[in-house]
Amino acid sequence: MSQGLSFVFELLGACFIGLVAAVCMTIFELPFWKKWGIEGVAEWQVNSVIVSMLIRKFSNRRVSISMSVGMHLLHGAALGIVFRVLLTLLGTAIPASSILTYAIVYSGVLWIISPFLSRSLFERAGGFRMTERGVAVSFLAHNVYGFSLGLLIPVLA
């Protein structure tokens, strides 16, 4: 198989692994959502705003929780690809233990970007306030995503 085609299959695998990691993250978030509603999970609020901005051009429908979670899973899959590309840029002979560390750092950077740094932007656009506990749950959930991603990405090698 050509090297280019092999890399495409690796990216598809990374997409799937990103999706699985996002599912793990979502499973972690479910009890907080059940207890506190959408305010208990900051990235679901962020995704709700994104979905709202996308669908309001085509529909008057309100954003449902399933739409928000769907966008959340889509982001997880896409960010799995981004992580794999970043690993490729760092070099090919990275030990699995280092990949786990890189994945946790990567998920921390993702959390810093959204929801932490972009918090006020999404609050204004969505007309809501992110709670401290929702942001804290988001931080923990991003670590679950990074840990899952870091454990699964070496399977592609």
PLM ranges: what are they?
Residues 1-157:
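Juxtamembrane/disordered regions of integral membrane proteins
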